[in-house]
Amino acid sequence: MTPTTAAIIVTADRILSGEKPNTAGELAASLMVDAGFEVGSHVVIAEGYARVAEALRAEVRAGTHVIVVIGGTGVGTTNYTPEVTGEFVTARLTGLETQVLLKGLESSHKAGLSRGIIGMTDRGGGSLIINSASSRGAVADTLGVVLPLVGDIFRDAR
């Protein structure tokens, strides 16, 4: 199976309120389109467990191949993206998580503060969920590592 559909979920109260522009989400959408994906959904949601769970559930049920969740990977009181993602992922790709960390550390010592995870919702296929910290640099690093391997991930998942 060749993955073709993607969704971008940005969890950020400051973007939702208009205090900050959605530059990381826009970059993610652009990178996904450049990689040949159809971005069917690009939403900004409030931070917090329930909102992230609801948005992920909708994309997984829709059969979206690649779901990028930006934000909520720190240790703040509303940062639950990794915990929610963990409930959906059955095959975690810790090697890719490490590659993303190493790539991020080339640019910023803060890369190690992200708790983002990457994994498949089903060992036989399903959706690939990618967590990224909310900076443009983090999104570029994360997708720069993962996107070249998406075809291999889905081929191996068969």
Model-identified regions with their sequence ranges:
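Non-catalytic beta/alpha edge segments that cap or flank active sites
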Residues: 1-158
